[in-house]
């Protein structure tokens, strides 16, 4: 399973699970509306959710990241998860994952952009 976690400031937001219509989350699945299903928040136990979010916050800080970013993970069937990368300039389009994650916790796109500007000053 593919998971992604947005960090804004120092806070991790709702985990998004990506379910592409192809075997892999390729360009077409990423940028064509309807080619992937996004489950937000991801269907994980509260314990797993909290651990992944805390680990993401720690990775974000440990890498020296600022303002916002998005961490990608693979989740194995046994519950182990593997950090893949930290995206320090994630997309902000209609199909992007950062706006989906923050919206799941009540933050509108407009407020997201304002927060990014505020944190960047």
Residue map of PLM features:
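ATP-dependent carboxylate activation and anion-phosphoryl transfer catalytic cores
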Residues: 45-121
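Phosphate-binding site of ATP-dependent enzymes
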Residues: 1-54, 80-82
């Amino acid at each position: 399973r593919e998971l992604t976690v947005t960090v804004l400031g120092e806070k991790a937001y709702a985990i998004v699970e990506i379910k592409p219509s192809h075997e892999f989350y390729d360009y077409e699945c990423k940028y064509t509306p309807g080619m992937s299903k996004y489950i937000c928040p991801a269907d994980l136990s509260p314990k797993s959710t909290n651990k992944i979010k805390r680990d993401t916050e720690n990775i974000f800080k440990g890498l020296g990241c600022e303002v916002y970013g998005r961490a990608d993970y693979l989740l194995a069937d046994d519950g182990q998860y593997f950090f893949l990368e930290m995206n320090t300039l994630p997309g902000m389009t209609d199909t992007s994952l950062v706006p989906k994650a923050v919206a799941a916790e009540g933050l509108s796109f407009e407020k997201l952009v304002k927060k990014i500007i505020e944190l960047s000053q």
